[in-house]
Structure formats: structure tokens, C-alpha cells
From Swiss-Prot:
This is Ribosome-recycling factor. GO terms for biological process: translational termination. One of its GO terms (cellular component) is cytoplasm. Pfam families: RRF. Responsible for the release of ribosomes from messenger RNA at the termination of protein biosynthesis. May increase the efficiency of translation by recycling ribosomes from one round of translation to another. Belongs to the RRF family. The lineage of its organism: Bacteria, Bacillati, Actinomycetota, Actinomycetes, Mycobacteriales. It is found in: Cytoplasm.
Length: 185
């Protein structure tokens, strides 16, 4: 019962870190990166679909992304979705592919993006702490019901704290890395 609780908590924390990693990847840096487009969706025959599933995304140069839709009819919707996103880029459509030139980030925009990255990191850490809190409540319930001894529960609580620290540290490292990418000129 205790092991199950710890395993579930660790699994959920791992997912929270994965979500944070994806969130941070979607914040654009000064370089072209296909991950920037992970959060952009297009209405594809009535279904909201990520553009990563509707096209191939290549980075031929450091500041250029080329998006080639699998269907030519999706050129305009993909272009519009990118233009309306919060990436701050202006795609051009040559009838065959969509080219997205990544402009140089201004110092002010870099600071805003660092704030955004820190906010996403903090959200992920809150999520990890909430998972810890729920697991602690479950451990308290196990102890109260007499399903496990006090020593076992205390040891499990210590393990849970170590796991929580490990995952919050991972999130801090992800944010620090992203901050370095953003501030690099």
C-alpha cells in the first residue's frame, strides 16, 4: 500500500516534469526550433490537430523554419494558425511551403520570456508539491487505518520528500537552462 502510493506519486511527478519540459520548449528563443510549434493547432476537417501532425517541420538555417504541409490545402490554415499564435513571427507562404523567419529577440522581449519560463517552472513545482501533499494525506490515512506501522510511514514520508526535492530540482534545472538559452545573444 505504501509502495503503491510512493510509486503513483513519483509517476505523477515525472509527468509534471515532462509537461514543464514541453511548456518550456514551446517558448521561443532567438534560434529556430521545431518545438516552438508543438502548441499550435489547426482545424483539420472539423478536428483540432497539432500542425506537427499535418506537416514536416525543418530547420535549414539558425533563424529559419520551413514547414511543408502533407496536404497543399492546409497551407493557408497552418499559416494563419502560426500568425495568430503568441510566437510573434510572420510566416510567408510561397504556395508550396511556409517559411518562418525567426527575428532577433529584443532585450525587453528576452526578459518577458524569462519571466514566462520562470512562471511555467513555478507552476510545475506547485503541481509537484500538490502531488506530494496528496501522497502525504494518503500515507496519513494508511497510518490512521493501521494498514502500516509508524516507522514504515515515517520512512515513506522521508522517501517522498527526497523524491519531491529531486523533481523540483529537475524543474529548476530546466528553467535555468531555458533562461540561459533566452539570455544568450
Amino acid at each position: 500500500m505504501i509502495d503503491e502510493t510512493l510509486f503513483d506519486a513519483e509517476e505523477k511527478m515525472e509527468k509534471a516534469v515532462a509537461v514543464a519540459r514541453d511548456d518550456l520548449a514551446s517558448i521561443r528563443t532567438g534560434r529556430a526550433n521545431p518545438g516552438m510549434f508543438n502548441r499550435i493547432h489547426v482545424d483539420y476537417y472539423g478536428a483540432v490537430t497539432p500542425i506537427t501532425q499535418l506537416s514536416s517541420i525543418n530547420v535549414p538555417e539558425a533563424r529559419m523554419v520551413v514547414i511543408k504541409p502533407y496536404e497543399a490545402s492546409q497551407l493557408r490554415p497552418i499559416e494563419d494558425a502560426i500568425r495568430n499564435s503568441d510566437l510573434g513571427v510572420n510566416p510567408t507562404n510561397d504556395g508550396n511551403v511556409i517559411r518562418v523567419s525567426i527575428p532577433q529577440l529584443t532585450e525587453e522581449r528576452r526578459r518577458d520570456l524569462v519571466k514566462q519560463a520562470k512562471g511555467k517552472g513555478e507552476d510545475a513545482k506547485v503541481s509537484v508539491r500538490n502531488i506530494r501533499r496528496k501522497a502525504m494525506e494518503e500515507l496519513t490515512r494508511i497510518k490512521k487505518d493501521g494498514d502500516a506501522g509508524e516507522d514504515d510511514v515515517a520512512r515513506a514520508e522521508k522517501d517522498l520528500d527526497k523524491t519531491t526535492q529531486q523533481y523540483t530540482h529537475q524543474i529548476d534545472e530546466l528553467v535555468k537552462h531555458k533562461e540561459g538559452e533566452l539570455l544568450e545573444v
